[in-house]
């Protein structure tokens, strides 16, 4: 059933022969067929994984694939600087040509007999959007001249939405073409998966990605929820304190990811990573956070498939902490120090037990003691599109750099709580800093409503607002849901209609918001109908008028 697996880029050796069900052989370089052969001989089911936004695609960029250079398809920021994964690997604008190249390269994996293909991390950075390739895509899609996203709210929202669409289009094209190739050539049913960060993490890090839109691609068979210490340790604010809350954040991240498969029959693997991408932390720090992400994943019992350990060679053969002197330049080369040590035996033993446990989590008897089930907080893909305010709205200092300084990013140290406390005090005293705080990686508008419920002990779920249009009865398992349109927007009026219908049938909606979000002013359906914001339309549908008083209102049976 392929309950557990991992991804690996190198050849098999005893330290990474973990006895799981499947292996995702990583990368489509010339060594791929030999690596596939080695793992297959060990009895593993073979998948292939590669990046869809970045990778060693120099032959495409240099014009060796089709005779035309494609360096203009790298992502570029407003200052003309390339947005890179490392100095020789740009993040791509996924053009039609690029999708054809990926399809051609991935046919080799189909020829080698893989059972499934994973294209990971469809990522278009919010700060990107200035390359010639993106300008062309904008003009094709919107049928109007390209507009720089930093100049207006509408331009920001439209550019961000297009970035997510472009990766949806690429995944749709590549998956359909490869499935047809496998069927016609080998009479084989190839499976196709998308490993992706959570909607919450991409919203924090300002990376555009299709997320819930992947549900509408029929040739996608499932996903890997790429949640680990590196995503979940991103600090947030609770009761005015800015700090890492790895368990709580991971719990919410895993929760929103299962919304991609709810009611679809598709597969979801939850990833757990015993370390993280940054090698500068100690083994004690890695284990401390691994325990928290692992427990968080186990608190979502409707998912029982796991990627148990990405890159096991760096766990079982690595020595930490390590020093990365040029990480600011995206050069990931690291060096041992006199503090570097191999994995402690006690941690290795714990991991061996966890790997076995993850293969036996299809448990039918589920009980949450002392908690109230059926409580949710709405989240939407549209939250991605309004994470950066255009020029003229943020008048305060750039808080992003100050938050990063408080976190000692890349140093292996936790948040400097004294520096963070000074920063939070300053934000509370200066209105000019509030919008900058809202657009920071702390993502306070979401965590401000979700974190108190988690801290109280409620087993809450992030609820994918977009899905109320896709699935009848999508909200029927919920008794109470928190909604705010201050950090996201409903795509169409029928979203509000579905929410009101759920309320009338007995649901309780807690709406949080004062209508102050500048993105209410974009050219969207609510403004075209004369509403100042989408909440006014929601309230009117509920029979409360456009501006009901704060308090409790009965609507039907809810």
Question: Model-flagged regions — what are they?
Answer:
Residues 54-84, 120-151, 207, 391-404, ...:
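Aromatic- and acidic-residue-enriched segments that line the glycan-binding/catalytic groove
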Residues 1-7, 47-51, 118-122, 157-208, ...:
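Aromatic-lined carbohydrate-recognition surfaces of secreted/lumenal glycan-active proteins
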Residues 2-38, 42, 105-116, 216-223, ...:
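Catalytic domains of carbohydrate-active enzymes, especially glycoside hydrolases
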Residues 48, 52-112, 138, 145-164, ...:
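Active-site-adjacent "subsite" loops/lids of carbohydrate-active enzymes
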Residues 27-85, 116-126, 182-194:
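Glycine-rich, aromatic-flanked loop segments that form ligand/cofactor-binding clefts
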Residues 3-16, 21-35, 53-57, 125-126, ...:
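Acidic-and-aromatic substrate-binding clefts and catalytic sites of carbohydrate-active enzymes
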Residues 182, 192-444:
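Hydrophobic targeting/anchoring helices
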Residues 488-558:
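A glycine-rich, often tryptophan-bearing local segment used as a flexible ligand/cofactor-contacting loop or short
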């Amino acid at each position: 059933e392929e309950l557990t697996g991992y991804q690996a880029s190198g050849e098999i050796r005893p330290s990474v022969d973990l006895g799981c069900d499947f292996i995702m052989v990583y990368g489509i370089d010339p060594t791929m067929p030999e690596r596939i052969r080695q793992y297959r001989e060990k009895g593993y089911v073979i998948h292939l994984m590669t990046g869809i936004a970045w990778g060693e695609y120099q032959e495409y960029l240099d014009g060796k694939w089709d005779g035309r250079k494609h360096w203009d398809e790298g992502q570029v920021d407003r200052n003309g600087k390339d947005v890179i994964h490392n100095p020789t690997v740009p993040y791509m604008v996924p053009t039609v040509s690029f999708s054809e190249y990926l399809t051609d390269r991935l046919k080799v994996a189909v020829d080698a007999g893989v059972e499934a293909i994973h294209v990971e991390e469809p990522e278009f950075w919010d700060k990107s959007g200035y390359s010639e390739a993106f300008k062309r895509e904008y003009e094709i899609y919107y049928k109007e001249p390209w507009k720089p996203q930093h100049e207006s709210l509408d331009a920001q929202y439209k550019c961000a939405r297009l970035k997510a669409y472009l990766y949806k289009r690429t995944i749709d094209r590549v998956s359909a073409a490869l499935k047809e190739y496998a069927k016609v050539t080998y009479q084989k049913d190839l499976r196709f998966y998308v490993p992706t960060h959570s909607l919450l993490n991409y919203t924090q890090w300002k990376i555009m990605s299709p997320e819930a839109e992947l549900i509408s691609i029929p040739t996608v068979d499932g996903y890997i929820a790429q949640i680990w210490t590196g995503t979940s340790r991103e600090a947030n604010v609770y009761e005015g304190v800015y700090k890492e809350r790895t368990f709580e954040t991971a719990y919410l991240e895993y929760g929103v990811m299962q919304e991609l498969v709810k009611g679809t029959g598709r597969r979801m693997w939850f990833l757990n990573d015993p370390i993280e991408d940054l090698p500068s932390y100690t083994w004690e720090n890695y284990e401390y956070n691994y325990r928290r992400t692992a427990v968080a994943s186990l608190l979502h019992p409707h998912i029982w498939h796991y990627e148990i350990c990405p890159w096991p060679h760096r766990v079982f053969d690595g020595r930490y902490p390590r020093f990365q002197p040029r990480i600011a330049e995206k050069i990931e080369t690291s060096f041992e120090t006199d503090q570097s040590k191999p994995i402690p035996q006690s941690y290795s033993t714990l991991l061996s037990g966890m790997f076995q446990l993850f293969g036996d989590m299809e448990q039918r008897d589920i009980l949450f003691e002392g908690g109230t089930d059926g409580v949710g907080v709405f989240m939407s893909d549209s939250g991605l599109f309004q994470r950066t305010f255009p020029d003229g709205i943020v008048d305060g200092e750039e808080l992003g750099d100050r938050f990063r300084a408080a976190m000692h990013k890349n140093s292996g140290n936790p948040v400097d709580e004294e520096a963070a406390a000074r920063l939070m005090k300053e934000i509370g005293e200066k209105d000019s800093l509030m919008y900058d705080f809202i657009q920071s990686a702390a993502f306070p508008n979401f965590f401000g409503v979700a974190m108190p419920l988690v801290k109280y002990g409620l087993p809450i779920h992030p609820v994918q607002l977009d899905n109320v249009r896709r699935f009848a009865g999508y909200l029927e398992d919920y008794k109470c849901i928190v909604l705010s349109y201050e950090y996201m927007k409903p795509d169409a009026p029928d979203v509000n209609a579905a929410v009101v219908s759920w309320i009338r049938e007995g649901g309780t909606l807690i709406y949080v918001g004062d209508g102050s979000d500048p993105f209410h002013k974009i050219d969207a359906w609510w403004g075209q109908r004369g509403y100042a914001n989408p909440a006014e339309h929601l309230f009117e549908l509920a029979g409360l008028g456009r501006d009901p008083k704060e308090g409790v209102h009965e609507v039907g049976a809810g």
